[in-house]
A protein has these predicted regions:
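A generic local secondary-structure boundary/capping motif
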Residues: 59-60, 77-80
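Proline-aspartate-enriched helix->loop->beta-strand connector
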Residues: 66-71
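Mid-sequence, gly/pro-rich, charge-dense loop/helix-turn segments that line enzyme active sites
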Residues: 79-162
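N-terminal short beta-loop-beta anion/metal-coordinating cradle
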Residues: 1-59, 65
């Protein structure tokens, strides 16, 4: 089962039409939609805004459902010049650009892990990339242009940049 989280209700609402055999459950002040997307069991949840809310929602879902992977989906800003609205970004590593636990740890270093960037799950990323490839091919066969898939680092933070 995959947990699909999003920080905005509109983002989860966009996924709901693809959910089959949906069942709503409630817990920790959140609504969890259980079902399947293309026969893959999933749980959809609006985590609310911020990393603490996302962590709390994920922790509750992980304690309640047989979650094997967590995917956070939704819109985001970008620093990459060739990224267009609708393009997909798949992480190979993740970091928090404004994490600062000095003087005990270097800027952006996750305390006690000795890492500034956390590696994404290569297995899940491969599955997502393969699914994108199948979808992009179907879009092209239907005469529609598919958004571009970009691979690379994804940063998060508490400061708005721009």
């Amino acid at each position: 089962m995959i947990l699909l989280l999003s920080a905005m209700p509109e983002e989860i609402a966009a996924l709901r039409p693809g959910l089959t055999s949906s069942e709503l459950q409630f817990g920790a002040g959140r609504e969890f939609a259980l079902g399947a997307i293309d026969a893959q069991p999933v749980v959809l949840a609006f985590s609310r805004w911020g990393k603490v809310a996302a962590a709390a929602t994920a922790a509750h879902a992980l304690s309640r459902y047989p979650i094997q992977a967590v995917v956070f989906t939704g819109i985001a800003g970008a620093l990459k010049q060739d990224l267009k609205i609708g393009d997909l970004v798949l992480a190979d590593r993740l970091f928090q650009h404004d994490l600062d636990a000095r003087p005990f740890f270097a800027p952006t270093e996750v305390p006690l892990l000795g890492l500034s960037a956390l590696p994404a799950c290569a297995t899940l990323a491969g599955r997502l990339e393969a699914a994108y490839g199948r979808w992009a091919e179907a879009e092209q066969q239907a005469g529609r242009a598919a958004p571009t898939l970009h691979r690379g680092a994804i940063a998060t933070g508490d400061q708005v940049i721009g």
